[in-house]
């Protein structure tokens, strides 16, 4: 593709590049990456990139401009930090000056697979591999759409500059990811990491959509042969991607979705999967998606053969691959589904006290959605490993731009309107806490999900848990009944009672932030009772 000297709208942003490459094809991107020396080709033709110092997002460097049109809506917190208009203007000018007279890549596309509610977007970058990342991850326009595309939101990625004055500005570091919601612009500096662009647009959608009555969600979604849509929520390591990939169901998307008056839609046009310890036997879909046009990040490979070692975390545990969604065979086209019939919250309970599966009322679903619980195992200074609870509102607090209760309220309204069933699944430990309990085996978990999705679970007799107040089934066809009652699965019943109480108290303590001063969200009655 020949370089252009101007693309509509760039001059208005203050950008005057020497050359512009606009929505390149994959073959053209490949040539640019090679020519620029940005990537290495793996043994099977997949491009590999080293993202530099940053191999993950920089959550403490994410800011929103404190301006009148949005400051009353934003959830100002340890996740969304304030920055002044003056600081934004100073750094914006720095970004524009840095990028002007350079060769730039411009990606124009969309976020949101529903044409009625999608957001047009633009990403300007100096690196061909970042253009590649955007081409993989966002919705790619047709040639006809590209001609008339007027981007509503723009990301200017000046990853090659740093904010040396961050201390005077009262900011966290030289890195910055700043959103100006009134001007509909995001500027990025100091980090090359691709996920900043992906989650940047998600943060914008998490602001914009709920204000229009559309629920934005950090979840995966699939659809059955009868057109029944299911949503899977869960923090990292709970099995969200693995469990929503099902040979009998078509994938709508693996990470970001919206729920509007027509149903569910994918916000993205691609997948961004973790590849540490990737095994072709357990995750064949992801393994087979890693081919030409995919982009591997920070993986270790043999310098001679260029064969990737997925078991190595020498650079980072957060090794990733981005690829367009059509690299997965069993997908829903377009990436949309009807209103969900089922919602499944996944948690890895390292305390081993939650039932493998429980049924939730709408109020309980809102409670657990706001709690966003999972538990990890962290080493203490004595070398003893014990679980630590993690609560992340809406199963994705890091990306929630509005107050979490806004999303929970919308969830409850939509569940009620469309008669949606919700379940809480423990994909973690049963029969004991870490060191004693065993992880729920994948075949049992998959069988439970099958019984949820085909409705057979509702034929079971349910028992209410004395602490967590959730209803769990006594029997499920094809699943060992001994594990369904979490207390019975423990040898030491007193230890179970003590641990269940301890986790229940953690839920209650965490939920105080939503109950206090909120008439709408005093859902403490629907959480644990000690």
UniProtKB/Swiss-Prot annotation:
Catalytic activity: oxaloacetate + ATP = phosphoenolpyruvate + ADP + CO2
Pathway: Carbohydrate biosynthesis; gluconeogenesis
Binding site for substrate: 57, 193, 199, 320
Intracellular or extracellular location(s): Cytoplasm
GO molecular function: ATP binding; metal ion binding; phosphoenolpyruvate carboxykinase (ATP) activity
Cofactor: Mn(2+)
Cofactor note: Binds 1 Mn(2+) ion per subunit.
A Pfam cross-reference name: PEPCK_ATP
InterPro entries hit by this protein: PEP_carboxykinase_ATP (IPR001272), PEP_carboxykinase_C (IPR013035), PEP_carboxykinase_N (IPR008210), PEPCK_ATP_CS (IPR015994)
EC number(s) from the headed UniProt entry: 4.1.1.49
Top class in the EC scheme: lyase
Transmembrane segments: none
PANTHER family in UniProt: PHOSPHOENOLPYRUVATE CARBOXYKINASE (ATP), PHOSPHOENOLPYRUVATE CARBOXYKINASE ATP
Family: Belongs to the phosphoenolpyruvate carboxykinase (ATP) family.
Function: Involved in the gluconeogenesis. Catalyzes the conversion of oxaloacetate (OAA) to phosphoenolpyruvate (PEP) through direct phosphoryl transfer between the nucleoside triphosphate and OAA.
Name of this chain's protein: Phosphoenolpyruvate carboxykinase (ATP)
Native source organism of the sequence: Leptospira interrogans serogroup Icterohaemorrhagiae serovar Lai (strain 56601)
């Amino acid at each position: 593709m020949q370089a252009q000297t101007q693309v509509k709208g760039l001059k208005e942003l203050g950008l005057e590049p020497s050359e512009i490459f606009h929505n390149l094809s994959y073959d053209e991107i490949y040539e640019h990456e090679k020519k620029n020396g940005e990537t290495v080709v793996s043994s099977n033709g997949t491009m590999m990139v080293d993202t530099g110092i940053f191999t993950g997002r920089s959550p403490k460097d994410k800011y929103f401009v404190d301006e009148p049109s949005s400051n009353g809506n934003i959830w100002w917190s340890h996740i969304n930090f304030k920055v002044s208009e003056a600081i934004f203007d100073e750094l914006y000018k720095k970004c524009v000056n840095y990028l002007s007279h350079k060769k730039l890549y411009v990606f124009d596309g969309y976020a949101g697979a529903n044409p009625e509610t999608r957001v047009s977007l633009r990403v300007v970058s100096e690196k061909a591999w970042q253009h590649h990342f955007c081409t993989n991850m966002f919705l790619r326009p047709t040639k006809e759409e590209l001609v008339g595309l007027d981007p509503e939101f723009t990301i200017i990625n000046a990853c090659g500059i740093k904010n040396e004055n961050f201390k005077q500005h009262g900011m966290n570091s030289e890195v910055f990811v700043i959103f100006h919601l009134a001007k509909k612009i995001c500027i990025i500096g100091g980090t090359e990491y691709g996920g900043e662009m992906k989650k940047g647009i998600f943060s914008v959608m998490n602001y914009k959509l709920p204000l229009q009555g559309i629920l934005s969600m950090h979840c995966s979604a699939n659809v059955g042969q009868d057109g029944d849509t299911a949503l899977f929520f869960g923090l990292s390591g709970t099995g969200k991607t693995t469990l929503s990939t099902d040979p009998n169901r078509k994938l709508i998307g693996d990470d970001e979705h919206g729920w509007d008056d027509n149903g569910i839609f994918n916000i993205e046009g691609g997948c961004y999967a973790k590849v540490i310890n990737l095994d072709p036997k357990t995750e064949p879909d992801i393994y087979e998606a890693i081919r030409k046009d995919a982009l591997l990040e920070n993986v270790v490979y043999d310098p001679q053969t260029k064969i990737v070692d997925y078991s190595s975390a020498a650079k980072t545990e957060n090794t990733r691959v981005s690829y367009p969604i059509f690299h997965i065979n069993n997908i829903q086209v377009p990436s949309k589904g009807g209103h969900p019939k089922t919602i499944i919250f996944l948690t890895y309970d390292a305390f081993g006290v939650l039932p493998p599966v429980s049924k939730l009322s709408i109020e309980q679903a809102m409670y657990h959605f706001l709690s966003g619980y999972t538990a990890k195992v962290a080493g203490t200074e004595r070398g003893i490993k014990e679980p630590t609870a993690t609560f992340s509102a809406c199963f994705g607090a890091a990306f929630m731009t509005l107050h979490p209760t806004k999303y929970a309220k919308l969830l409850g309204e939509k569940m009620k309107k469309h008669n949606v069933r919700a379940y809480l699944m423990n994909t973690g430990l049963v029969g004991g806490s870490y060191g004693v309990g065993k992880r729920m085996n994948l075949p049992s978990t998959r069988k439970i999900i099958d019984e949820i999705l085909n409705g057979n679970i509702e034929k079971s007799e349910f028992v209410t848990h004395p602490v967590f107040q959730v209803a769990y089934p006594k029997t499920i066809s094809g699943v060992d009944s001994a594990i369904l009652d979490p207390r019975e699965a423990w040898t030491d019943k007193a230890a179970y009672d003590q641990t269940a109480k301890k986790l229940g108290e953690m839920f209650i303590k965490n939920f105080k932030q939503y109950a206090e001063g909120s008439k709408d969200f005093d859902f403490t009655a629907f959480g644990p009772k000690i």
